[in-house]
Amino acid sequence: MIRTKNIFLIGPVGAGKSTIGKQLAKQLKLEFIDSDDVIEKKCGVDINWIFDLEGEEGFRKREREVISEILAEKQNIVLATGGGAILDPETRSLLSSRGKVVYLEATIEQQLERTSKDTKRPLLRVDDKRPVLEQLMAEREPLYRSIADVVVETNGATVKNIVNKISTFLVEETIL
């Protein structure tokens, strides 16, 4: 039996899913995919535009469809999901049943620091991001934890250190 090595990175905005995912994929010699990039490429517009036109519900539907398509077409990948991908029950089920789910945990302070100048995140187009981030974490943290095979704290850690922690976990789980 050929074992599929799918690794899914979940977590809040600013946790480093894309940055860590690229390095993890490079180290493990797997393909890296960012679901937000795939959505933008497929739709031909940026995520802000989709949110403005279709709202969050429309975006989440597209996100679920794209993740489902990726998992139907690809194996042996590192997939960085959007921070809210776990809001959809079908997406949670897909991720938890098709690979190892790594929850990259980040504090509100870290999220604020990493998103302070970012204008590409539709839910953070506000003057005071802290209350929004706090609300998002209150809603999403239980969902992240519910499907995570491992939780990796990203605060104060280097990308290399985080990648090594994930790799160690994957070896212990015999996925590598």
From Swiss-Prot:
Q: Keyword Kinase: yes or no?
A: yes
Q: Which GO BP terms sit in this record?
A: amino acid biosynthetic process; aromatic amino acid family biosynthetic process; chorismate biosynthetic process
Q: What is its main location?
A: cytoplasm
Catalytic reactions on record: shikimate + ATP = 3-phosphoshikimate + ADP + H(+)
EC number(s) given by UniProt: 2.7.1.71
Which cysteines form disulfides? none
Q: What are the protein's UniProt keywords?
A: Amino-acid biosynthesis, Aromatic amino acid biosynthesis, ATP-binding, Cytoplasm, Kinase, Magnesium, Metal-binding, Nucleotide-binding, Transferase
Taxonomically, the superkingdom here is: Bacteria
Q: Where does substrate bind?
A: 36, 60, 83, 140
Kindly give the Pfam families that the UniProt entry links to this protein: SKI (PF01202)
Query: Into which EC class is this enzyme placed?
Result: transferase
User: InterPro entries from the entry?
Assistant: P-loop_NTPase (IPR027417), Shikimate/glucono_kinase (IPR031322), Shikimate_kinase/TSH1 (IPR000623), Shikimate_kinase_CS (IPR023000)
Residues holding Mg(2+): 18
Q: In which pathway does this enzyme or protein participate? A: Metabolic intermediate biosynthesis; chorismate biosynthesis; chorismate from D-erythrose 4-phosphate and phosphoenolpyruvate: step 5/7
Compartmental location: Cytoplasm
Give the co-factor note.
Binds 1 Mg(2+) ion per subunit.
User: What are the protein's GO molecular function terms?
Assistant: ATP binding; magnesium ion binding; shikimate kinase activity
Assembly state and interactors? Answer: Monomer.
Report what the protein is called: Shikimate kinase
Gene that specifies this protein: aroK
